[in-house]
């Protein structure tokens, strides 16, 4: 049965269409429907997938819980999907929560004591666990025991509770913020990388089939190359392109229809959107390519400093459009060329003057 897409008007105005985080609860429900259920259906992340295949097979042969797993990397790359796949492959239940939700030790204790043998507990944003909750987690991970304080004041006493063997799958976009004691308790650590265009095209083709959308190979490739290496963005763009194709292209997503739809959405062939270009154009036109301080840049484009640092900059820096230097932000040669402008001699390393003589 085909999965129904959300309508074009359901996206809020504020979130970016190329944001790697979910932009609505409706999108999260669609993501769950598109999510692969088994490792053999999972596209990309070859190293992590091959390692998990071996570790899961070995744990199942021994009848043991899989060792604790830490998944880290940028948002939207499939950490939650892998947690669900691990539980499916192990043939056990998955309990899901997130670091900010576990405010008190009792919150975590309630989850742990309700786990069945070899179940998977998935904690998203595990770097945001409070120190007091993290302390409860240490003996649970090592010895499958927790200490619970009963009573108050001088009459209070500590009681050890035995837990069923379980697997903790922790996910984080900021592995550097994990404490060393917590990081050391994970036996399996996998970093998820950005996807290449061919891998994303396979994901787009699979999702289009589940959405009952007619897509050509060229159409899938066009969506994939504008998706910033991120499956979540690829699936979101696919749904928007599907809407466009149903109205403007007789329901067929080919390269031309995909290109026109994404141009309408202001997503260019490199996956940059209006906010990206606004920032790059400000550096080039208002500050001669930089360097420029982030506060001056924020004032120039009318955005908050945190928005620039946390939302706009990361992709531009990772893909060579922007440099962050002690003196401020500087546009690279890639930016000048992307904007169709001739870079000054300083941006080209002085080669222009050298070759003009």
Swiss-Prot record:
Compartment(s) of residence? Cytoplasm
Q: Where is this region: Small ATPAse domain (RuvB-S)?
A: 196-266
Region described as Large ATPase domain (RuvB-L): spans on this chain: 13-195
- Stretches for region Head domain (RuvB-H): 269-357
Its Gene Ontology cellular component terms are: cytoplasm; Holliday junction resolvase complex
Coiled-coil spans in chain: none
Spell out the reaction equation it catalyses.
ATP + H2O = ADP + phosphate + H(+)
Q: Please list where the region (Disordered) is annotated.
A: 1-30
Q: Which GO terms describe its biological process?
A: DNA recombination; DNA repair
GO function terms (MF aspect): ATP binding; ATP hydrolysis activity; four-way junction DNA binding; four-way junction helicase activity
Gene3D superfamilies this protein is in? 1.10.8.60, P-loop containing nucleotide triphosphate hydrolases, Winged helix-like DNA-binding domain superfamily/Winged helix DNA-binding domain
Annotated binding of Mg(2+), by residue: 80
Q: One Pfam family for this entry, by name? A: RuvB_N
Residues the record lists as binding DNA? 305, 324, 329
**Residues reported to bind ATP:** 34-35, 76, 79-81, 142-144, 185, 195, 232
- Say what the protein does: The RuvA-RuvB-RuvC complex processes Holliday junction (HJ) DNA during genetic recombination and DNA repair, while the RuvA-RuvB complex plays an important role in the rescue of blocked DNA replication forks via replication fork reversal (RFR). RuvA specifically binds to HJ cruciform DNA, conferring on it an open structure. The RuvB hexamer acts as an ATP-dependent pump, pulling dsDNA into and through the RuvAB complex. RuvB forms 2 homohexamers on either side of HJ DNA bound by 1 or 2 RuvA tetramers; 4 subunits per hexamer contact DNA at a time.
State the family named in the UniProt similarity comment for this chain.
Answer: Belongs to the RuvB family.
Q: What is this protein called?
A: Holliday junction branch migration complex subunit RuvB
Originating species? Bordetella parapertussis (strain 12822 / ATCC BAA-587 / NCTC 13253)
Upper taxonomic classification of the species? Bacteria, Pseudomonadati, Pseudomonadota, Betaproteobacteria, Burkholderiales
Gene responsible for this protein:
ruvB
